[in-house]
């Protein structure tokens, strides 16, 4: 997503929590290609940390016009008997609290300029209802509701709010499945394959562009038709 936004001409701030080397490597690669990119450390579940990060981003790169909410944490499979309220809160911290803190931090300047793009990264699991995953599915469902409510509230201020719902995309961080598991998933997808990160990035860049100026409150599924509606 950072690459797609940079290629679309945006200055990119890459947030990281612990993996500084990966964020710095990504930004260095983008700068080598002539783009503007800089890493910023923060725990997006922590309000003071988010406020500090946004202030640092604005000082280094200018006003924040686009926010892509993509932070996530550990996602263990747990039966109903194994799940606790804390296991739900752990997911809500990433998918409801962190979007709230980020949007609250950038909203004053977005309102003042009459422009903003908020792009949440959701998941197809809300439609699929994956078993042993209710805490994650519930948090992602809440994130979708949050997106739609914000879209109505902020539309008159020139701020769009949308959600991209990817399927199972192989990424460096989260992809530890077996070949059999990957093959089984791909076979169930109408397009008979898994997606790639670049396909999600292009949709994010589209929603950030002027071409999407009249699109708000929408969920765009990037999953090869796996949740045909």
Where are these regions (language model features)?
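A short, exposed helix-loop element centered on a Lys and neighboring polar residues
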Residues: 103-104, 148
